[in-house]
Amino acid sequence: MGIIIGIDVGISTTKIVGLHEQHVLSPIRITAVDPVTSLYGAFGKYLHDNNISLSDVEQVMVTGVGSAYIDGPVYGLPTGKTDEFIADGLGARFESGLSKAIVVSVGTGTSFVQCDGDEIRHIGGIGIGGGTVQGLS
């Protein structure tokens, strides 16, 4: 089927999305303390909820701070890693259709990413974001 699965393993939340023929398939969020548990739990739930078999998955891409704990293929599938700021920029560009933008990613912290054509770069950020506020509540 050729589905690409993207997984952002964050400190407080793991986000997962599928892409098939340039269409986004049902993004979900999972909360778990352990990043490996969070990744595999999110992946299993995503496949189950969307009636996708492992053989339908062409590739898995991981990013986020928790991706440092992933050293090999996820469930034996071709697995790659990408920089979180690049993933944020590419995702925002894909969804918006814009070639120039400032992307604000609010997670445990808040980052600012500049997209200008094919150039995507981190331009700053702060240590407070939605994850911080959620943790304080």
Protein language model regions, located:
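A short acidic Gly-Thr/Ser loop motif
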Residues: D8-S12, V65, V104-G109, I128-G130
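Conserved phosphate-binding catalytic cores of ATP/NTP-utilizing and phosphoryl-transfer enzymes
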Residues: I70, Y75-V104, G109-E119
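Short beta-strand-loop/turn "lid" adjacent to the catalytic site in phosphate-handling enzymes
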Residues: R29-A32, F43, H48-E84, E119-H122
